[in-house]
UniProtKB/Swiss-Prot annotation:
This is Urease accessory protein UreD. GO terms for cellular component: cytoplasm. The gene is ureD. Keywords: Chaperone, Cytoplasm, Nickel insertion. It comes from the Bacteria. Required for maturation of urease via the functional incorporation of the urease nickel metallocenter. InterPro entries: UreD. It is found in: Cytoplasm. It comes from Paraburkholderia xenovorans (strain LB400). Its main location: cytoplasm. Belongs to the UreD family.
Amino acid sequence: MSLHENHATLATAQAGAHSQWRARLELGFVREGERTTLKHRLHDGPLRVQRPLYPEGYGVCHAVIVHPPGGIAGGDQLAIDVDVGAGAHAVIATPGATKWYKSNGRAAQQCVGVRVGAGGKLDWLPQNNIVFDQANAKLDFSLMLGDGATALGWDATQLGRQAAGERWSEGSLHAVSRIVGADGELLWFERASLAANDSLREAAQGLDGFSAYGTLWAVGAACDDALAEALTAQLGFDESIRAAASCVTSGVLVVRAVSRSMEMLQKALTRCWVQLRPVVHGVQGVPLRIWAT
């Protein structure tokens, strides 16, 4: 499996600066008969995976990634590498929101790389990001798919601690997401670069004043314009939430949403996932138990 940094570099960083964390987590899922097994796990620093669960039967392995510090501060660097082998099906989630703390001028970074082998299936379902005031966050997500692999996933972000009445008035957010097909073709690429004082936050062609936004992506042969239109017809478009689906290329569907409430946005994305899962993976969409805790 690919490594973002070697052990010596990580150890030196942690020993030399206790105020920042560098952490890496590797996960490898394989298909063994009728069972998907978490065969490989390796961690450095404060990233862990809980004991694998099988609420859908042994063919689908659920793994929950935890970050014990509870948030990502300035200077922190987190790297997550996931390999889902041929024919395996992995569901990967987090137990709570990822908090991006005040950075004191230093950027915090999270890099995620996921590979899904031929005929494999992935559900990438982390809970949302919360960007604190004065946070400077960098996020990088890459998904590489083998022949016949299918994938469903999302990413959602709340700017400012809305529940605490805090606005995101200073800081920056840079995010890159890419999905690459079996032949190396770039299926979807998105780059977002946003400063707290950026006029796009209020502009109609930007966030239009909404503080929460998210994207759900689906990759599979069934993802087409008709499916996108059917989803859009069921999504809200008013002063509380605005959402729509589109087929960005053959076999790739994207749902985008903005909302004044992260709870409302997450519910909308969850409904989409429940509807899409049987179509994309051929598996019933049942909300994860961890979402109810």
